[in-house]
UniProtKB/Swiss-Prot annotation:
GO terms for cellular component: plasma membrane. InterPro entries: ATPase_P-typ_TM_dom_sf, Conjugal_tfr_TrbL/VirB6. Its main location: membrane. This is Uncharacterized protein RF_0091. Belongs to the TrbL/VirB6 family. Keywords: Cell membrane, Membrane, Signal, Transmembrane, Transmembrane helix. The chain crosses the membrane at residues 612-632, 722-742, 754-774, 796-816, 833-853, 866-886. GO terms for biological process: protein secretion by the type IV secretion system. The lineage of its organism: Bacteria, Pseudomonadati, Pseudomonadota, Alphaproteobacteria, Rickettsiales.
Amino acid sequence: MQSNLLKVLGVLAIVATLVCFIFAALGMIGAVKVGDGCYMRYAPDGKGGSDSITGTITLNANANYVNTSKMLPDGTTQLIPDPNRYGEWLNTQVLVENNQPVNLQVVGQVSLCLAYVPKDNVQFTESTRPGKSNLDDKGNMIPIPRITDANNPPLSLIMDAKNNEWRNIAELYANDRVLVSVSPNFANTDATVEDAFKGTKVTKNCSQGQTSYEPICGKYSVYHGEYVNDCEWRDKYWKCNYHHSCDTSFWGGCGLGCPCAFGKICCGEWICDSCGAWVNIRTSMPEAYKDDGSVTKAWSDNINNLFFDLFNLECSNNSKTLPNGQCPDAVRDRSPKNLDFIKGRCSGTWVEDQCNDGTVSTPELSNYKYFWYTADGKGGKGPTGLIYQMNDAGSVSQALPSKLEFAKFVADTDQPADYKDKDGKYLYKVIYNIPFNSNTEKSYLQYRLWSPTSQDASKNTGGYVLNIKQTKCYRENGNSFNDTFDDRGRVQYIIVKPSENPNTSGKTYSPQGINVNSDGKYNFNANEAGYIWMKILNDPSNNLRDYKDSEGNYKVHFSTSLKVGSFTIKVMNPLLELFKTKVQGAATSIFKNMVCYKANDSSSCTNFFTYIKAILILYVMTYGAMFLLGFAKINQKELVTRIAKIGVVSGLMNGNTFEFFNNYLFDAITNFSDAIIANMSGYSLYTSTNTISNPFMFLDAVMSKIFFSQTFIAQLLSLLSLGLSGIIYFIITFIAVGIVIITALRAVAVYIMAFMATCILIGIAPLFISFLLFDFTRYLFDNWVRFTIRYMIEPVVMMAGIIVLTQLFTIYLDFVLGYSVCWKCALPIKIPFIGTILPIALLNVPIFCINWFAPWGMDYMSGMMGVNMQNIVALVIIAYGMYGYVEFSGRMVAKLTSAAGPSATEIGGRMSHDAGQKALSPIGMDDKTRQGITGRAEARLKQRNKTLDQAEKNRKNTPKEGGEKTNAEPPQPEARG
């Protein structure tokens, strides 16, 4: 036994070492993905006996998981998504059974399409750039960077103040995120803006002192022409006081009341006086821009505060009508009109151009001479004069709504940090960041610069630069919305057989949609067995353009709990039920055929009752004759014994013999072992049908864990995360588990052989019971009884010890591997001796880390996880004890029953040995191959020794130079006759 065990241990050690290094190599080079997520020791309900698996997958928005290398102009390579692999399903590596519950949570943000510059945008319309308002000079659509794209600045669109109409800046779908900002007012410097349509930078002079600016300068004016800037007094400016002149020589002149009816003779001619008047001093609008803000209008959301009409200001009434030099003048009134507003209010009296007995106040006009609106917005509230609206049609129009929405700067805390330069000055300042939450599928965000409707906007000057970032088709945490494509963004799943790949199978599947709650959580029961595959629903049209334009990913956290497959139900029950049925059927058939029980055709069998009757008659006649002739003496005890024998044997001649054996003795004897084993182990052997299942229920826990638990495999592999010591732990534990498996299989083989032998012995019971009659055949009956009892007891004795040892093994196995396991960084790679070269701070810093199964909470830096070597040693001792107890129990039963001969233990051990040799033969590890190798090695060694001996002899007989032999024997003297 010891030699066989050593062979088994050697084989298991070699296999374990190979498995260890193979998995370590695979983990290091990343050739396979052994697992992911976590395998929990206990289910969420705190109970064991199930695989509670948690895992996380990354679900890409573009549904592309294959990268290819692309050569860049500088000679370097870059990984890019394979252009032919968009829109594919992702295997989550979560294997489920039918009706298995799965809990998941979707976390993350994705953008499922890319925003492009819309038609009729703030820079060009279809009327100014027919058919190309949204295309660059090369005819391509112009993409808008996403909000999360920190590597690219926002897209700039130039807004000219001459365009007095609503224009689009963004096409918005449901739940879109948009960030509209305005470039600053470039004061006393040049402005440079990237023209999105030309693809080049545009630079213009924006320094102060000018009256006309390009739109990129960040300032505009709606004023043009001239306005009255000051008032000047002019004497004798116009002919005023139109009246008659009086003839003083007639009736004392006009003062005597000469009636005008007398005409010229009385009153004289019509004449005018020469009067002074305040005349307008005009200057051009707008006045030159100044950086000090003296000519800049403050931000306001009231149009009455935005514009003051300077066109209608006059120093005096009718001042716009110049004197014609005639009497009377074209106008009769040139009295002061806006003099106080323009010139200032005189606290005394104006005498011509002098303020007598008073002072002149500051002209109110100075408070209204604000000709410029700037993107900075004087006062810092927003870009002055910029208004916006939402329009579902996206059409260009000039109509103003009754209520205007003026753009404002968002709070400083909401301004992106990358929108400032290194000095903290804003490169762009956000004016709109409101998510588009609407029931409409699509709408447009429009902007325009405010301009008085009474004026010709084509004479305006300047403008603003609007900048935009837009995250289109935005979804988060697995939520979906309808836009131009129904249910865009819904996470879908299909369950596919392990042998299928839905991306290449060509089959049509019926995806199931995930309706997550507000936290992104969803629960479902698998509708079939297989792997879960997932992807995000998106518009597949236009050659998968939306998939190709998508960006971002979801983290899908899985948790599922599946009861570990029962070794008893999946393996032992089918095996033993089939075996028992066949063996019991064969045994009963033997019995029935021996007695021709209910045989319709007696020619097919020979009724053994006939022989029993003949033997019984012969026995009675012979013994009666001997008794009458005095050859046989009989006492009372012997008489009773012989009558009992005759009674038992004669009972076999009854036609109901088979029913008696089948209903009372057969099941009682064959199930004797099962019932006792069940009582010893404490496991019920009865199923819902109240029939005995099998006696190996005590193996269910440990064998189910070993063969069907994914958690156990992960726990075992996690020992490798301890490095070199972990390899030793892994090999020892693997060997212990292997010994237990072999022992369990040997126990099953012993049970099978004992059960089969018992059934056969019961099947031929009529034959051996008839041997009870004669003394010279009595030993056959006695041996039949001994072997029947031996094969009934042998499984009981064997299982009694294995039950105890199995329970101990299960406990210690949980001591060794009783922890949750996660796939994570487990084996850090560090630079050796770095502490002698670099500062001590870098001593424990890994260069990179190899992912592997590692215990929950394990610190990969220290590599400690608290494995107790005592428990591992105890595990091996228990496994070794189980292996040896199988043969020990066979010897024990042989002594107890005094039945010499083959035992079920020996036969079962031979069966398991032959099976093991068959499994080892393909790799050359079976006994026959090893003996052949050993024999050939011994033969080669013997041949080598012979060759060496022959070479030594030849060397001794080789003559030296000069003809002498080396090591030659001295010549013998010649014999004398």
